[in-house]
Amino acid sequence: MKKTALLNAQLSHCIATLGHTESLTICDAGLPIPLSVERIDLALTAGVPSFLQTLNVVTNEMYVERVVIAEEIKEKNPEILTALLTQLQKLESHQGNQIQVEFVSHETFKKFTLESKAIVRTGECSPYANVILYSGVPF
């Protein structure tokens, strides 16, 4: 059995096989997931697991160089945005790099998810709690 925090085999495999610049999306319970992209559905019930819990566990396993966030989160969900940006700042310190943050429209965000290796659906039930994480290299 693994001794790191991430126990979900499907998600662990996905992160382990990410190449440089490939992406993984973490989303709320409502984001449409294209049929062409692998779905890793962690949602159990409303709020479980939360977007931020899932982000924390994933970023403990994944080296992140860039993220994409929907612009609408600034107005519709500033609390999650603040917590997300705080987690990214901590991740920068831990990784020793600067993470590029890009805001795009929600429609553009949904198009970008088509390129993700997988989309991780959480139980989060708050608007625009979604992020696309782009894999970097730790050397």
Swiss-Prot record:
It is found in: Cytoplasm. GO terms for molecular function: D-ribose pyranase activity; intramolecular lyase activity; intramolecular transferase activity; monosaccharide binding. The active site is at residue 20. GO terms for biological process: D-ribose catabolic process. InterPro entries: D-ribose_pyranase, RbsD-like_sf, RbsD_FucU. Transmembrane segments: none annotated. Its EC number is 5.4.99.62. Its main location: cytoplasm. It catalyses: beta-D-ribopyranose = beta-D-ribofuranose. Pathway: Carbohydrate metabolism; D-ribose degradation; D-ribose 5-phosphate from beta-D-ribopyranose: step 1/2. It is an enzyme of class 5 (isomerase). GO terms for cellular component: cytosol. Keywords: Carbohydrate metabolism, Cytoplasm, Isomerase. The keyword Isomerase applies. Substrate binds at residues 28, 106, 128-130. HAMAP family: D_rib_pyranase (MF_01661). Homodecamer. Catalyzes the interconversion of beta-pyran and beta-furan forms of D-ribose. Belongs to the RbsD / FucU family. RbsD subfamily. This is D-ribose pyranase. It comes from Haemophilus influenzae (strain ATCC 51907 / DSM 11121 / KW20 / Rd). The lineage of its organism: Bacteria, Pseudomonadati, Pseudomonadota, Gammaproteobacteria, Pasteurellales.
